[in-house]
């Protein structure tokens, strides 16, 4: 127990940690610069299991006092004054807390520990509790607005707004719950926009039931079949390409035409009772016709080139 007691005009501090003495007996002048004995206060420790100091006027007891200044070793501070700091709110506003004794408190404990130490603060119908900022608590709902003796100011570790029986959190989340900012700018991936604004025009396709398409398909099939037959008729037609095969086919056809012309000549066919011509004669006639036909074809090519 430590005791500091000086003159009444100077500060007095009385500390009784873990004392079970009656805290209602005024003994000294305290925390007052004047000589008035009515403003004296006594500093005593909380007689519960917590280390701390309690300030209250020397003319009142703990049971009927409305002013409490509680310094606890667990970082719980309560300041009560008989006067309200702000003019009382009588219009039925949402926060009539300035209407009574103002209590300032800092709480480092859990809410259950605060309730065991100061049930008046926790059980109030309207309270504004904070854990990282200042808040106001009041029980003006249970008492008339003219009673200025029960207003509280609470400072604790997280911000909780309590109006009636609802508790709403008004403070941002703790820094430990936030993800660290790495400084990287995350950008949404954008799809490359095409010149047609992403719209692809369908190709104009003809329906398979179109008569023109069906006819063209059938024509191509017939041409391929005839070419295969011609390759088989021309000697060595399957061993060369299509152009060479066609040229040979043309020459072969002309040769056949000459043979037909020679064989159809009357001179080669004697009259009835006559003698049939020799094969050598027929061959000479065919060669003459072929040579003449080649000269005619060459002349036509030269004239076409000259033109």
Swiss-Prot record:
Localization terms from the record: Nucleus
Q: Tell me if Nucleus is a UniProt keyword of this record.
A: yes
Ranges for region Helix-loop-helix motif: 221-256
Induction details:
Induced by jasmonate (JA) treatment.
Q: What residues does the bHLH domain cover?
A: 207-256
Q: Which domain of life is it from?
A: Eukaryota
UniProt KW keywords: DNA-binding, Nucleus, Transcription, Transcription regulation
Q: Where is the composition biased (Polar residues)?
A: 12-28, 183-197
Q: Where are the annotated segments for Basic motif?
A: 207-220
Q: What happens when the gene is disrupted?
A: No visible phenotype under normal growth conditions, but the double mutant seedlings rhd6-3 and rsl1-1 do not develop root hairs.
Q: Name one GO cellular component term.
A: nucleus
Please give the biological process terms from Gene Ontology that the record holds.
regulation of DNA-templated transcription; root hair initiation
User: Which one of the record's GO molecular function terms can you name?
Assistant: DNA binding
Database matches in Pfam families: HLH
Protein function: Transcription factor that is specifically required for the development of root hairs. Acts with RHD6 to positively regulate root hair development. Acts downstream of genes that regulate epidermal pattern formation, such as GL2. Acts with RHD6 as transcription factor that integrates a jasmonate (JA) signaling pathway that stimulates root hair growth.
Q: How does it assemble?
A: Homodimer. Forms heterodimers with RHD6. Interacts with TIFY10B/JAZ2, TIFY6A/JAZ4, TIFY5A/JAZ8, TIFY7/JAZ9 and TIFY9/JAZ10.
Protein name, entry field? Putative transcription factor bHLH086
Q: What is the originating organism of this protein?
A: Arabidopsis thaliana (Mouse-ear cress)
Q: What is the lineage of its organism?
A: Eukaryota, Viridiplantae, Streptophyta, Embryophyta, Tracheophyta
- Please name the gene that encodes this protein: RSL1
């Amino acid at each position: 127990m430590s005791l500091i007691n000086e003159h009444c005009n100077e500060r007095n501090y009385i500390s009784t940690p873990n004392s079970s003495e009656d805290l209602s007996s005024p003994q000294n002048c305290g925390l007052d610069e004047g000589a008035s004995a009515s403003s004296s206060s006594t500093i005593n420790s909380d007689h519960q299991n917590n280390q701390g100091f309690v300030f209250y006027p020397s003319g009142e007891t703990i049971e009927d006092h409305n002013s409490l200044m509680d310094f606890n070793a667990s970082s719980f501070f309560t300041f009560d004054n008989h006067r309200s700091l702000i003019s009382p709110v009588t219009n039925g506003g949402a926060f009539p807390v300035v209407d009574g004794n103002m209590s300032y408190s800092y709480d480092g404990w859990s809410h259950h520990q605060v309730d065991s130490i100061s049930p008046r603060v926790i059980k109030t119908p309207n309270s504004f509790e904070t854990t990282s900022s200042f808040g106001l608590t009041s029980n003006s709902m249970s008492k008339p607005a003219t009673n200025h003796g029960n207003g509280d100011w609470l400072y604790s570790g997280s911000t909780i707004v309590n109006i009636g029986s609802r508790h709403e959190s008004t403070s941002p989340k703790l820094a430990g719950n936030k993800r660290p900012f790495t400084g990287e700018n995350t950008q949404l991936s954008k799809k490359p926009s095409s010149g047609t604004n992403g719209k692809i025009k369908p190709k104009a396709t003809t329906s398979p039931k179109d008569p023109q398409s069906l006819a063209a398909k059938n024509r191509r099939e017939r041409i391929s079949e005839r070419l295969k037959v011609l390759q088989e008729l021309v000697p060595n037609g399957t061993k060369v390409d299509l152009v060479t095969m066609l040229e040979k086919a043309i020459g072969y056809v002309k040769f056949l035409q000459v043979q037909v012309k020679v064989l159809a000549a009357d001179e080669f066919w004697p009259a009835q009772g006559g003698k049939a011509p020799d094969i050598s004669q027929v061959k000479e006639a065919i060669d003459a016709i072929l040579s003449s036909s080649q000269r005619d074809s060459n002349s036509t090519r030269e004239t076409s080139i000259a033109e």
